[in-house]
Amino acid sequence: MTNGYIGSYTKKNGKGIYRFELNENQSRIDLLEIGFELEASTYLVRNNEVLYGINKEGEQCGVASLKIDDNGELHLLNKCLSSKAGTGCYVSISEDKRYLFEAVYGAGIIRMYELNTHTGEIIRLIQELAHDFPTGTHERQDHPHAHYINQTPDGKYVAVTDLGADRIVTYKFDDNGFEFYKESLFKDSDGTRHIEFHDNGKFAYVVHELSNTVSVAEYNDGKFEELERHLTIPENFDGDTKLAAVRLSHDQQFLYVSNRGHDSIAIFKVLDNGQHLELVTITESGGQFPRDFNIASSDDLLVCAHEQGDSVVTVFERSKETGKITLCDNTRVASEGVCVIF
């Protein structure tokens, strides 16, 4: 049995963090329940037996740490709600487990926290830094919108996507916080959202929410150079849709991207050691607004959370040979689910 967690909005019926048990032998979710009620816990990241989630209480915003016990159940360690500037949308951990990074979409800021490497507790907010970059012309690009922050494969920097400014910004970081290093620009109105790095560290897959495209970019010393790009929806689709999540299979052979509105998952074959992509197929996600999904470590199953409609959580069997996914007859509900991790 594999334990997984789903983060959610808490605007309507969402409860914060859901816990589920994935039965990989039977290709189904045997249990899905409230793991821990945590307001606005829309993104999660795991460090072994500690789970970190976005959190807010009233006007105070920040992050929370939770202990995962032997049964997969969650117990609060502590919270660090040191800002009133807005609720985050993405969190990640540095390779040395000393820092927690947070991106705040609405306010266009990034935050950096110090962690206790022994207990996993959050010690303090080190810095809160606002983006101040020229923005694109799309109506949603009224100001900078930091959407993703994570350490680069070389370990030297953090890369931050800015949906409002159509770019990736890299920063050096240490105990004093962030220091601007480089920026990489994409097309106007792309709405640069998330990055998935190939294991070789040379290539990155950059997804753009507003243009519904994925770029293959060469990564070198904090800089991203676009090599090619692909649509993630059919060319003839003219409905309202926006790209969401991106994940590589663990064997690095296939890339998956979800589309909210078209309600699908696009599957690409990874070619030439990560340098090129080739569209395999686009598959219905089985629900409305597939905000996030993840692939089990076995590479056999994919679990997708849907933010809207009935907020179903769908399970797909996955072919390691073709990359294609097949919807299983097993759905659960995680209200307002927007993040899936194992």
UniProtKB/Swiss-Prot annotation:
Gene3D superfamilies linked to this entry: YVTN repeat-like/Quinoprotein amine dehydrogenase (2.130.10.10)
InterPro entries: Cycloisomerase_2, Lactonase_7-beta_prop, N2O_reductase_N, WD40/YVTN_repeat-like_dom_sf
GO CC field: cytosol
GO molecular function, one term: 6-phosphogluconolactonase activity
Origin superkingdom: Bacteria
One Pfam family from the record: Lactonase
Family from the record: Belongs to the cycloisomerase 2 family.
Protein name: Uncharacterized protein SA1737
The species this protein was found in: Staphylococcus aureus (strain N315)
